[in-house]
Amino acid sequence: MLELFDVSYEELQTTRSEELYKLRKKTFSDRLGWEVICSQGMESDEFDGPGTRYILGICEGQLVCSVRFTSLDRPNMITHTFQHCFSDVTLPAYGTESSRFFVDKARARALLGEHYPISQVLFLAMVNWAQNNAYGNIYTIVSRAMLKILTRSGWQIKVIKEAFLTEKERIYLLTLPAGQDDKQQLGGDVVSRTGCPPVAVTTWPLTLPV
């Protein structure tokens, strides 16, 4: 089974923080070459703290994917890290930002198979989580490569603003809608590609057969 559920920062510290931070270092520093702060083989930053929540995707006891959520009324990447890019964007008082989205490709292939739509499942989990927490959409900053992945998913994302980190490197502030249409579209795709029961994609947390 593939289980996706959310935990608080405090819960993470007593369970899988070391595993998560090591996989984030492997993804964002080693594979993608991002300029992130790493220590003792792990990556974490100032937004990993009380009030932050994390979706964890677990298969056979191993973490295969994750994404982090920070409330917009707290320091976040939009208003702090990339404030110089998006200071002219007005954000709602009540909302959430997602960041540190990743899939460990090697683990996913080994545990789920070459063609399992793990990114699509994690997108669906984000929608179900948002609905469960009364968020109509999710704000996020992505690279051009991630923008292409999201666009191909069929999720009806919206680009709020494009910004240039360097002369060649662009980033995008997006809204990811979390309505019933989005749930049905992403969930229907997961059902068609995995053969799981339709009811399995409607819940939060998610438990999917593999």
Curated annotation (Swiss-Prot):
Stored InterPro entries: Acyl_CoA_acyltransferase, Autoind_synth_CS, Autoind_synthase
Catalytic reactions of this protein: a fatty acyl-[ACP] + S-adenosyl-L-methionine = an N-acyl-L-homoserine lactone + S-methyl-5'-thioadenosine + holo-[ACP] + H(+)
Enzyme Commission identifier(s): 2.3.1.184
Top-level taxonomic group: Bacteria
Keywords, ordered alphabetically: Autoinducer synthesis, Quorum sensing, S-adenosyl-L-methionine, Transferase, Virulence
Gene3D superfamilies referenced in this protein's UniProt entry, alphabetically: 3.40.630.30
One GO-annotated biological process of the protein: quorum sensing
GO terms, molecular function: N-acyl homoserine lactone synthase activity
The UniProt record lists the keyword Transferase: yes
SUPFAM superfamilies linked: Acyl-CoA N-acyltransferases (Nat) (SSF55729)
Enzyme class at the top of the EC tree: transferase
Primary role: Required for the synthesis of OHHL (N-(3-oxohexanoyl)-L-homoserine lactone), an autoinducer molecule which binds to EsaR. OHHL is necessary for biosynthesis of EPS virulence factor (extracellular heteropolysaccharide) which plays a role in the development of Stewart's wilt on sweet corn.
Similarity comment: Belongs to the autoinducer synthase family.
The protein's name: Acyl-homoserine-lactone synthase
Species for this entry: Pantoea stewartii subsp. stewartii (Erwinia stewartii)
Organism phylogeny: Bacteria, Pseudomonadati, Pseudomonadota, Gammaproteobacteria, Enterobacterales
Name of the gene encoding the protein in the UniProt record: esaI
